A protein has these predicted regions:
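Extreme N-terminal tail/first-helix region
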Residues: 1-20
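Short amphipathic alpha-helix with an adjacent loop that forms part of the alpha/beta core around
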Residues: 30-33, 101-102
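Non-catalytic C-terminal accessory region of glycerolipid acyltransferases
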Residues: 2-5, 95-211
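A generic structural signal for well-ordered alpha-helical segments
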Residues: 17-19, 78-79, 103, 135
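Glycine-rich, highly charged phosphate/nucleotide-binding loops
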Residues: 21-25, 91-97
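Short, basic, glycine/proline-bearing loop/turn elements
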Residues: 13-15, 81-87, 114-118
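Short gly/ser/thr-rich secondary-structure transition/capping motifs
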Residues: 19-27, 151-152
Length: 211
């Protein structure tokens, strides 16, 4: 994938802010393959999740963003130049699905959230079928990721972010044999999403030694 200088500049600025305001632990970066295509599947508690998780991944990331953010002028220019994928959250968005699959087929790296939306209480929510569909259709490796602390830093009902440690655990890549069961019929994509979500739920921060 061609290097996007604007993306990397923005990433660097966000990383500085993250290290200053939300510094936490990062575990398992070695599990992220050096090259794409690749799906990063994470829990979702906060608007902070996409940019902060993106700072932990040594790749140029494609993110979903709701279509309403594409406003005339600078917002439209900005969203296009950092190569976000517009998605209509009011219904099934075939266009977003096609763009995501195309990005992966081109060797890209995409972050998706199996829960589909931010958690109301910071707890893990049931997975929806979308991530499973994309994973099964492309057969790409899926790296499960779990974010800790972003709900406390900027939960769904918060007005402004609060300084709080945000930590990340990245698991080993799941291969198609780990999540896809073509014989499962109509439940294939939902089952794949649930297997991916189970891998996310299994991730924990290492226990700290007792003093």
């Amino acid at each position: 994938m061609k290097r996007n200088l604007l993306y990397w500049l923005c990433r660097q600025l966000i990383c500085v802010a993250s290290d200053t305001v939300f510094r936490g632990e990062v575990v398992g970066v070695h599990n992220v393959p050096r090259t794409g295509p690749l799906l990063i599947a994470s829990n979702h508690c906060s608007h902070l999740d996409p940019p902060l998780l993106g700072c932990q991944i040594p790749h140029q990331i494609r993110f979903f963003a709701r279509k309403t953010l594409w406003k005339p002028g600078i917002p439209n220019w900005w969203m296009n130049h950092i190569e976000c994928i517009p998605v209509d959250r009011d219904g099934a968005d075939v266009g977003a699905l096609k763009k995501t699959i195309a990005a992966l087929e081109a060797g890209g790296v995409v972050i998706l959230f199996p829960e589909g939306t931010r958690s109301m209480d910071g707890q893990l929510q049931p997975a929806k079928s979308g991530v499973g569909m994309i994973a099964c259709k492309t057969g790409v490796p899926v790296v499960p990721a779990r974010i800790f602390g972003s709900f406390e830093a900027f939960g769904r009902n918060a007005k402004i972010p609060t300084p709080h440690p945000v930590s990340y655990v990245l698991g080993r890549p799941l291969r198609p044999a780990d999540y896809d069961d073509p014989a499962s019929g109509k439940q294939r994509y939902q089952l794949a999403s649930e297997r991916i979500m189970a891998a996310i739920a299994a991730l924990e921060l290492p226990a700290r030694p007792l003093l």
